[in-house]
Amino acid sequence: MKTIDLNCDFGESFGVYRLGKEEILPYITSVNIACGFHAGDPLVMRQTVQLAIRHGVAIGAHPGFPDLLGFGRRMMAVSPEEVYAYVVYQIGALAAFVKAEGGVMTHVKPHGALYNMAAKDARISEAIAKAVYDVDPTLILYGLAGSELIRAGQAQGLQTASEVFADRTYQADGSLTPRSDPQAIIADEDEAVKQVLMMVCDRHVRSVQGTAVAIEADTVCLHGDNEQAVRFAKRLHAALQNEGIAIQAMRKETRR
């Protein structure tokens, strides 16, 4: 039976600012929790870990650039050494809360501009993979399907999860269409569901240029920061089940 993980970025509130809907949790299997750099704060991190444990979803760290004002979506001129330190720091912060609450951390998924940079920059992706491995070699590294980050994780000896997006369009080279492009976002829910089923079942996606691009899908990213998020998650969950696809979190491989 085919399986797929449904993941969602979570815990991206901080201070008095609130973002994300708890109602989406019954329809996903993994959460990527902000670690205080692009969003989140210590109290939100702890509360989000508690929420994830209560709902039985897999817990992952979501490290990003230190950029609250830009929500971690702005590119920064950083060295691999800086990226390594950023990632170790943020994984460590979340890991402490997970341990304190009696949970288990399963994965790491970079956020925003760091994620996009790692998709194409081999040195940045290698720094991220090494940081994850050095903290805990059993953690699963999430990255854009077919990206440098997936290759770096595999080369480092990490288990990886190739991620695809429900509401983002793709270029002919398999990269995501930049958010600055009017065609970047799929607003039509029917089209988004159709795209996910194509990627999961047929292992390809239709690019904005009209070409079929081969793609590996281990996990699907759902965005939980808009009004339609819960409705769409529920609908996609049902559509996948109707196709006989099991929805479950990534499982750590047994390593010898």
Swiss-Prot record:
It is an enzyme of class 3 (hydrolase). Disulfide bonds: none annotated. Catalyzes the cleavage of 5-oxoproline to form L-glutamate coupled to the hydrolysis of ATP to ADP and inorganic phosphate. Forms a complex composed of PxpA, PxpB and PxpC. Its EC number is 3.5.2.9. GO terms for molecular function: 5-oxoprolinase (ATP-hydrolyzing) activity; ATP binding. It comes from Geobacillus thermodenitrificans (strain NG80-2). It catalyses: 5-oxo-L-proline + ATP + 2 H2O = L-glutamate + ADP + phosphate + H(+). One of its GO terms (biological process) is carbohydrate metabolic process. Keywords: ATP-binding, Hydrolase, Nucleotide-binding. This is 5-oxoprolinase subunit A. Belongs to the LamB/PxpA family. SUPFAM superfamilies: Glycoside hydrolase/deacetylase.
